[in-house]
Amino acid sequence: MVKLWRRYKPFINAGIQELITYRVNFLLYRIGDVMGAFVAFYLWKAVFASSHESLIQGFSMADITLYIIMSFVTNLLTRSDSSFMIGEEVKDGSIIMRLLRPVHFAASYLFTELGSKWLIFISVGLPFLSVIVLMKIVSGQGIVEVLGLTVLYLFSLTLAYLINFFFNICFGFSAFVFKNLWGSNLLKTSIVAFMSGSLIPLAFFPKVVSDIFFNDTATTEIYTPVMIIVGKYDTSQILQALLLQFFWLIVMVGLSQLIWKRVQSFITIQGG
């Protein structure tokens, strides 16, 4: 473990330094995310105002507000840029520097992202989560219940990030074949955002569509952790959702190893 830490600590530090160096860029993106969350909030407010029911598909306006906030936080913490990084490094030829290092290729990206994710969690995730926990306790929910859901949320959040990371690694490996992933990355991000429930809770989709989406990888990345912390899952549903996350994590890790072995024959160094 100590040897592993020493080997990958520079990548963690690099992730931290990159976030600190480009903090203005990070801040501007977060402002954009917050504006998007406000747009979603007022859209749902208009929907509830035009409805004669206080509940829509089992969600109250308070539930939707909490869902929007935690969807924003969860998306921020589970987002992975590994496919973008691989695509850019393949395009400019700097991928050779990573390939020559005596470290696991995918793990080098993982630990780089973990460095930045730790800072994001401390600066954004933890404050939001603390406020949500306090609000739930003040509203009358049991402390043990709230803390239990929070722990399960964090556990599910970790699994969700790892699933998303290895999914993006698998997608990023196609850069060795196609050489440029910029456009396809944007398309992939939009599709995943829709299917993951980050834009609209899957409970609002037609049953046939929601049943299909519920079992895919995208759902486990956003919808599952958010539904846990919002309190819309009972014990059996939480267990089922976590098992599904474990399943997809194993699949994605195995698939990433398989694809990596296949694409190594396509490696060519561009740039000069």
Predicted regions and their residues:
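Hydrophobic transmembrane alpha-helices and immediately adjacent juxtamembrane helices
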Residues: 1-272
